[in-house]
Amino acid sequence: MDTLLAVRARGITKCFGDVVALDGVDLDVTHGQIHGLVGPNGAGKTTLLGLLLGLAVADSGRLEIQGEPVGRAFAVPDGVAGFVDGPGLYPSLTARQNLAALAALRGQDARTAGVDDVLDQVGLTDVADDRARGFSLGMRQRLGLAAALLTKPRLLVLDEPSNGLDPAGKKQVHGVLTRLAAEGTAVVLSSHRMDDLEALCSEVTILAIGRVVFSGPLSKLAADNRELDYRLVTSGPQSARRLAAGTPGVGVADDEAGRHGAEALVVRA
């Protein structure tokens, strides 16, 4: 097992105009670990995954992959593969042709690159000669995973890999990721599904408004019973108070109505 970290990020900041997508993010991922990124839409998960894949560069902070500092060039770091916002596929090509084209870009033919092997790993052998334009979302996700596996990555980066998967497809993908981790590959994935995180991840990082609010073992998160405060802006504060009062484990910690232009409540849960 490698002793160096697959990913080491310190103080990573990324802005898009006036929008701060990542604000001082730290992240450690070890080899053989499946690390989940969790958070609401707009939390910064996809931006962080894009940095790991070389699709963007941080404005500040330090990012190391496999112990090597990531430079300012837009390039996929060595040993890294994956996708964000869904895999990029050629819709007019078959599944096999898509993978063969990717192999050719790396100077390999389909046989030596192991195209048939990765198709089998993700359960697409029976549709290998079907055009990608007819694939369901789940099939496209699995083909994207197969494309990443062609490179035999040491770090696999996946954005919502379970999207669109039926139970059989999810079992297949989970099996692939678990096996890769057992072989020493680091996997970083985002997911909105707690069942995916519980089934796959040993560590999770929770992002909110571009900041890390928790990072550590999933078991520690499950045992964490700290209360959190949420500031809610509402046009119906009376109804919100009644709803909070009638919900077990939820209460109004502060009433900011009248102190702001909009009615606001701080709800503790």
Description of each model-found segment:
Residues T3, R268-A269:
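C-terminal coupling/interaction segments
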Residues L4-V7, K14-I209, F214:
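ABC transporter nucleotide-binding domains
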Residues A9, C15, T30, I34, ...:
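Intrinsically disordered, low-complexity segments enriched in small/polar residues
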Residues H174-R268:
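ABC transporter nucleotide-binding domain
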